[in-house]
């Protein structure tokens, strides 16, 4: 097993450049990490060293399972799986964990009594279905009925410093109101892919999230403590990769909530081989995606807008082509200048 979780340093100085350089030319970004100009610059910076790691994996242990945590997840995974289509390369993201915290409160039942499936692109996914295990009752009507009041008052003290109710829900509510499905993430990520997002995003809450994340990272980087002292290794790990590795070693054939894999008809409206985020079945041989039946065509139209950007970014990196990088930027729906 190989786990990739890297950043090119100095992480936050470079991220500031991803924000400020486009701003000098009049371009405003919602977050600048995974989409738009910042997402492209980030991908061009971090993907080459990940490709180098995968070159070594392909030489030393070509049958290894490779798990990636590095952003921009979508573009990293697309580039690696294009160069190494036979590599067991799986992208993992933490956003799906929001469902484990929120659905039990909305549905008024323990998480163990909930079945759900979500999918789309990384950081651009929706809750597709949810039901109660005991009664098999469809829970989406209840979720839709309660969603506005619940999220309007939801305080995300898990990731932000302030206690502002309903923070980072501007783009979230626009998508829910228009498409009638619950996004599994918030404005900072959703807003990176949609051309009209800047005008409705909660920028104050986004900066609150960014500042807390930055402070946490810098505190850890600057700490002289060892990993063993900084983290409580006696606690049961919450990282989903642990459960996935257990599932592979024990051939459990269980369904994992979210993995990033090349599309093989898992979302029918998305071109094949574009990396999608979908549930996956974990066994000793591989992690295989689960087809999301009846995925809403209207929402997938937003996802399709990213397909050409993703492909051009991949080609730019693998071919080391400045021309392809510029074309990826020009194809991005959020680039309006």
How would you label these PLM feature ranges?
Residues 42-49, 95, 236, 305:
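Soluble or luminal CAZymes and related metallo-dependent hydrolases
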Residues 13-84:
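Rossmann-fold NAD(P)-binding glycine/threonine-rich loop
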Residues 9:
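Active-site beta-alpha loop architecture of Rossmann-like, nucleotide-cofactor-dependent enzymes
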Residues 55, 60, 65-134:
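Rossmann-fold dinucleotide-binding core
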Residues 48, 52-55, 59, 78, ...:
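A broad, structural surface signal
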Residues 43, 89, 320:
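Flexible, glycine- and charge-enriched loops at secondary-structure boundaries
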Residues 1-6:
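N-terminal Rossmann-like NAD(P) cofactor-binding module of classical short-chain dehydrogenase/reductase
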Residues 108-337:
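Long, compositionally biased stretches enriched for glycine and/or charged residues
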